């Protein structure tokens, strides 16, 4: 459960903080993934692709840092 404090009726900052907390908790990603049923084999393929993408990103970052 996500709690957000409202200070002096400041709704704009409260809404911004609420959205940040939702993103940190990966709430939007979970909603998107659960919108449709994903077969276990498709889930494995997707996770492997995500891992490969992270590896490439890390390799690029490491190459530019050196």
From Swiss-Prot:
The record's listing under NCBIfam families reads: S21p (TIGR00030)
- Which terms in the Gene Ontology molecular function aspect does this entry carry? structural constituent of ribosome
Q: Which InterPro entries match?
A: Ribosomal_bS21, Ribosomal_bS21_sf
Query: What organism does the record attribute this protein to?
Result: Rickettsia akari (strain Hartford)
Q: Which family does it belong to?
A: Belongs to the bacterial ribosomal protein bS21 family.
| Record keyword Ribosomal protein present | yes
**Keywords (A to Z) from UniProt:** Ribonucleoprotein, Ribosomal protein
What is one Pfam family matched by this protein?
Ribosomal_S21
According to the UniProt record, one GO cellular component term is: ribosome
Keyword Transmembrane recorded: no
Report the transmembrane regions from the record.
none
Listed name of the protein: Small ribosomal subunit protein bS21
Gene from which the chain derives: rpsU
